[in-house]
């Protein structure tokens, strides 16, 4: 009975983690912490050094990918750090609004639309040229999309490894 509860909990977290990641919530962190919790809860059954190392590496790469693509992808367009932060805040704010209006897909589209709108508004106010503003806005939307896809891929990999660790493990007995 205990194994059934543990497996059910792991399956629930493995499904919830990537969904939370889509909403810009800490789904990948939840997946990693759940895996570590299982490993230290019953180390005979669930502790696997290679698997946990792979999960930590995938988690770090997913966070690094989102940070670098989201921020430095826009920064290479030679905008100020204020613009980068303004675009990130616009993206996050409209992600939340998009999630409220149209769950799941709305968060992804909201993040891209928020980055687009914030970049367009910044560049239009800064330079006053709508063509340059449109170009920066499209770049911001694309960078936000690529950042989210990379982090979601890491979340799906973490979910698969959590299922491998808890549901599809080999009995050592």
Label every PLM stretch briefly.
Residues 31, 51-59, 79, 83-91, ...:
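Alpha-helical transmembrane segments of multi-pass membrane proteins, especially transporters
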Residues 61-99:
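Helix-adjacent hinge/juxtasegments
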């Amino acid at each position: 009975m205990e194994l059934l509860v543990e497996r059910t909990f792991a399956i629930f977290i493995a499904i919830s983690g990537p969904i939370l990641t889509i909403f810009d919530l800490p789904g990948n962190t939840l997946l990693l912490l759940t895996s570590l919790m299982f490993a230290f809860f019953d180390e005979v059954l669930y502790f696997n050094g290679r698997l946990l190392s792979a999960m930590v590496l995938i988690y770090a790469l997913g966070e690094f990918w989102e940070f670098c693509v989201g921020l430095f992808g826009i920064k290479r367009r030679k905008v100020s750090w204020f613009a980068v932060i303004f675009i990130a805040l616009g993206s996050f704010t409209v992600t939340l609004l998009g999630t409220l209006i149209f769950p799941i897909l709305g968060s992804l589209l909201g993040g891209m639309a928020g980055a687009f709108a914030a970049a367009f508004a910044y560049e239009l106010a800064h330079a006053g040229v709508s063509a340059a503003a449109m170009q920066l806005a499209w770049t911001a939307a694309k960078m936000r999309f690529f950042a989210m896809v990379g982090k979601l891929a890491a979340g799906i990999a973490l979910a698969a490894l959590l299922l491998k660790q808890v549901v599809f493990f080999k009995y050592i007995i």
